Each structure stands twice: as C-alpha cells, then as structure tokens.
Regions:
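Conserved alpha-helix/loop element of class I SAM-dependent methyltransferases that forms part
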Residues: 96-114
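Conserved class I S-adenosyl-L-methionine
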Residues: 113-124
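Non-catalytic substrate-recognition/targeting regions of SAM-dependent transferases
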Residues: 6-22, 29-96, 103
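C-terminal catalytic and target-recognition region of SAM-dependent MTase-like enzymes
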Residues: 227-287
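S-adenosylmethionine
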Residues: 173-254
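Short beta->alpha hinge that forms the Motif I/post-I loop of the SAM-binding pocket
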Residues: 123, 143-147, 211
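S-adenosyl-L-methionine
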Residues: 145-191
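Conserved SAM-binding loop of SAM-dependent methyltransferases across substrates and taxa
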Residues: 125-139
Length: 287
C-alpha cells in the first residue's frame, strides 16, 4: 500500500460504520466511506462535535447536516494550496490519498533532468496538474466539466502557478486524445483518473471494466519516444489491481518496456494507527 502520510493540513482521525472522521485544516467533517466496514468504538469527540456531517438519503444522494463550516477555505500540502468547497455529493474537491501520487510524479519530473510534458486526463480540480507544474513540467489539463477546470485554475492561482505553462482544456478525454494523435502531439507522462461509470458527449455509456483496455491503448498513442511515467487511478472495487497491471503491461510495457506496479492507496488513521484503503493506483515507469 502506498500511504499518503505527509499531510499537515489534512488528517483522517478515525473511520468505521461506513463513515470517516476527517480534519480539513481547522474544519472537522464526517463523510461516508464504503470501505470503513468495521464497527470500532467511536471515542473521539469529533464524531459528535463537528463542522458538518454528510448524510446519505434512502433514495440516493444526500446532504450536509449540522453545517458550521465555511462555504470554502484553503489547505496546504507542502508548497501547494488547494481550495476546499464541500459539494452536494459529499466531495470536497481534493482526494487526499492522491498525495502519494503527487509526490511520485514530482520526484520523477525533478530527477528526469530534461523538460517534461504531462497530460492529465479526467483531471478534476487539478491537484496533480498543480503538483506537476510546481516541479517544472509543462501540463495539459483535460476534464469534461467546465466547473472543475475553473476550480483547477483557482488551485493553480492559489499555489502561485497562475503563469505556469498549463494548458486548460474542457473536453471529452477520449475525443481530445484522438485529436492529439491526429495532430502528432506527444507527452512524456500521462496521469488519468477514469470514472467507474459515465456517459460521453453523445450519450455513449462508459463502463471502466469494458472501456479501460481500449482507452489505455488509445492514450499510449500520445506517449513520446522517451516516456517517463504513466499513473492510472481506479476506484472500481470489482477491478483487481493485478488486472490493471495486466492491461498496462500488455499495452504500455509492450511498446516501451519499463516496469508496472499496482498498489492500494491508503490514508493513515490517527486513532488506530492503521490505514484506510482508498482505491488502487497503477504506475508504469520507464526504468
């Protein structure tokens, strides 16, 4: 398991009974988490005294209750600053477990000793984009949601990177990659966080288990002749890490050699000293 254990402004205080107790800066939040299936004692005062709890409804969706948190605030991760805005579907705008990948990407970029171009697909609010730009990379940030790209720009500005070489694209990721291939555009590194399920711009259904292999084949077409790394996040519980490794090996490694490794991402739990699993990341590296 790759742990994101260098946070100061975020803390996973406790988890269990389908929920997690978190500290985001000075705000204490309770949010659902399907992985927290254990029934451990709730001894921390934050379970009862918090700034907001997201409660799921019986009909799907949910809402924030007992809200005393601001509409937005910022937290830092090293020299990066992120805007936190609790949304109607439990999310805050940052997945803190991804910090392990931000650290990995920055290390790869810094030690490359050459200019590095990164393509960030399904890029959400741009934490990975900002991390890579802070390490000196040129980044192309792609997400189909205009609001998420605007949020990502805010994160770049808050991190002092508003003038960094970042190309902001609102587009369907597959369609964009197809056009980049036709244009002959190439990238040294790719980061992608494909959804488990979704619909494309013309209503076509995306299912990760069915579409992942052809999508990896597609994006391999924009890798440069001297690629550095590929990071792919998969949050689908039914997809085994070894299956994702198999796909990366048969597509990326077949073309470029290198090494592929899949691991769970995890967050350390303060109250127990254990770790909460938070999805799977697969990393391909050239060496």
């Amino acid at each position: 398991m790759w742990l994101s254990e260098h946070w100061k402004d975020y803390e996973l205080i406790d988890c269990g009974r389908g929920e997690k107790l978190e500290r985001w800066g000075d705000q204490i939040l309770v949010r659902p988490d399907p992985q927290a299936i254990w029934n451990t004692p709730r001894t921390h005062k934050g379970w009862k005294a918090n700034n907001g709890r997201y409660a799921r409804s019986n009909t799907g969706g949910g809402q924030w209750q007992n809200k005393s948190m601001p509409e937005r605030w910022t937290i830092n991760y090293g020299n990066l600053t992120f805007n936190i805005k609790p949304m109607n579907f439990k999310h805050t705008g940052i997945f803190p477990e991804q910090a392990a990948n931000w650290d990995f990407a920055r290390e790869q970029i810094k030690k490359a000793g050459r200019p590095v171009s990164v393509l960030n697909l399904f890029a959400y609010t741009g934490a990975a984009t900002v991390a890579c730009a802070s390490a000196g990379a040129t980044v192309c940030h792609v997400d189909a949601a205009k609001g998420m790209v605007a949020w990502a720009k805010e994160n770049a500005k808050s991190s002092g990177l508003e003038n960094a070489p970042i190309r902001w694209i609102v587009d369907d990721c597959a369609k964009f990659v197809e056009r980049e291939i036709r244009r002959g555009k190439q990238y040294d590194a790719i980061i992608m966080d494909p959804p488990s399920y979704g619909r494309g711009p013309t209503g076509e259904v995306w299912k990760l288990e069915e579409n992942l292999y052809p999508f990896v084949e597609l994006v391999s077409g924009v890798l440069s002749d001297n690629p550095l790394f590929v990071i792919m996040n998969t949050y689908t519980t039914g997809l085994a890490p070894s299956a994702v490794t198999y796909i990366m090996e048969t597509v990326i490694s077949k073309k470029f050699g290198g090494h592929t490794e899949s691991q769970e991402l995890g967050l350390p739990v303060t109250e127990t000293g254990l770790a909460l699993p938070c999805g799977v990341t697969t990393r391909w590296t050239a060496k």
